[in-house]
Amino acid sequence: MGKRLIVQRRGKGSPLYRSRPWLHPAPARYPPLTPVTLRGRVVELVHDPGRWVPLAHIVLENGDEFYIPAAEGMYVGQIIEIGPDARPVNGNILPVGKIPEGTQVYNIEIRPGDGGKLVRAYGTYAIILGRSGNKTIIQLPSGKVKEVPNDARATIGIVAGAGRLEKPLLKAGAAYYKWSAKPHVWPRVRGVAMNAVNHPHGGGSHQSPSFPTTVSRNAPPGRKVGHIAARSTGRRKR
């Protein structure tokens, strides 16, 4: 009798393949919208094993607390401003309609008050290109140009953690602990490298499926691997 495929084990929903909420200190989002400008202080920079970016724990003068992805150059004790009259300096949070053109921003809201949805990965930033009525035009890290409402908030600066990939892993054990904080399977073994009992492509004294890898969309779960319901495979003929 064969063994279950990884996709079948993942579908079961066991803890190995689920996100680990206890690793996340808190949601990284802006506080609710307010018409006034508030000052806050960065009380700590928190390591979040569930993401590649450190979080900045900020306490406002009215007592509210929140976490956001830290900006490059942000430090403990830094005073930040949040609101429509905040200055456009590194770490401050203000509506994109009040940010000068050419400024680098991150953690941008798509709708005012949603807490920040765009440009949150390490080392990324967007650029304010201009205005179009009640919309602000921004260029995302991918190069795509997008319009967001002028009231949508963003943080001035670049997301911290840009040098994450510069440190080599050196050994497989480091990669093991790196991926243990994520709901991923590591290492990822190819089907042709498995035994026949573990995968439809496994077995034999060769690493080849030995049969076409296209499979019907209606195939049973233990067989549904490879090119699922593929219209064509390989390079397109000219």
From Swiss-Prot:
SMART domains: Ribosomal_L2, Ribosomal_L2_C
Record text on subunit structure and interactions: Part of the 50S ribosomal subunit. Forms a bridge to the 30S subunit in the 70S ribosome.
Alphabetized GO MF terms: rRNA binding; structural constituent of ribosome
Gene Ontology CC terms: cytosolic large ribosomal subunit
Gene Ontology biological process terms, A to Z: cytoplasmic translation
InterPro entries: NA-bd_OB-fold (IPR012340), Rib_uL2_dom2 (IPR014722), Ribosomal_uL2 (IPR002171), Ribosomal_uL2_arc_euk (IPR023672), Ribosomal_uL2_C (IPR022669), Ribosomal_uL2_dom3 (IPR014726), Ribosomal_uL2_RNA-bd_dom (IPR022666), Translation_prot_SH3-like_sf (IPR008991)
One Pfam family this sequence matches: Ribosomal_L2
Alphabetized UniProt keyword annotations: Ribonucleoprotein, Ribosomal protein, RNA-binding, rRNA-binding
Function comment: One of the primary rRNA binding proteins. Required for association of the 30S and 50S subunits to form the 70S ribosome, for tRNA binding and peptide bond formation. It has been suggested to have peptidyltransferase activity; this is somewhat controversial. Makes several contacts with the 16S rRNA in the 70S ribosome.
Lineage: Archaea, Thermoproteota, Thermoprotei, Desulfurococcales, Pyrodictiaceae
Region (Disordered): 198-238
Keyword DNA repair: no
Biased composition (Polar residues): 206-217
Name of the protein described by the UniProt record: Large ribosomal subunit protein uL2
Similarity section: Belongs to the universal ribosomal protein uL2 family.
